[in-house]
Amino acid sequence: MNPIIEYLTGMNVLTDQIIAMDLLISAKNGVRNYAMAATEAGTPEVKEVLIRHLEEALDMHEQLSSYMMEKGWYHPWNPDEQVKLNLKNIDTAIQLPTL
């Protein structure tokens, strides 16, 4: 993408942290959706496939959350620290138009 367009649209601030958080949120949604689908499966074969996909989604979630914790971007066991990080990210997002 053109650097000028990236700046004007705010796409120049797409960081690894933002991408990782988006993937983590998507992984959480995948886990939830596979779990719900498995409980509604019409046949044992379909349920088995959905459970296998659920396990893969759980593995992906674990890998993403571990990566983010190693980087200091995610603090699931320390709510106070996570709130501080979230507030810092909010302040950064608010300041983006002025950067």
Curated annotation (Swiss-Prot):
A biological-process GO annotation: sporulation resulting in formation of a cellular spore
InterPro entries xref list: Ferritin-like, Spore_coat_CotF-like
Keywords: Sporulation
Keyword Nucleotide-binding: no
Protein localization: Spore coat
Tagged with keyword Protein transport: no
Superkingdom, natural source: Bacteria
Gene3D superfamilies (alphabetical): 1.20.1260.10
Recorded family membership: Belongs to the CotF family.
Record protein name field: Spore coat protein F-like protein YraD
Lineage: Bacteria, Bacillati, Bacillota, Bacilli, Bacillales
Name of the encoding gene: yraD
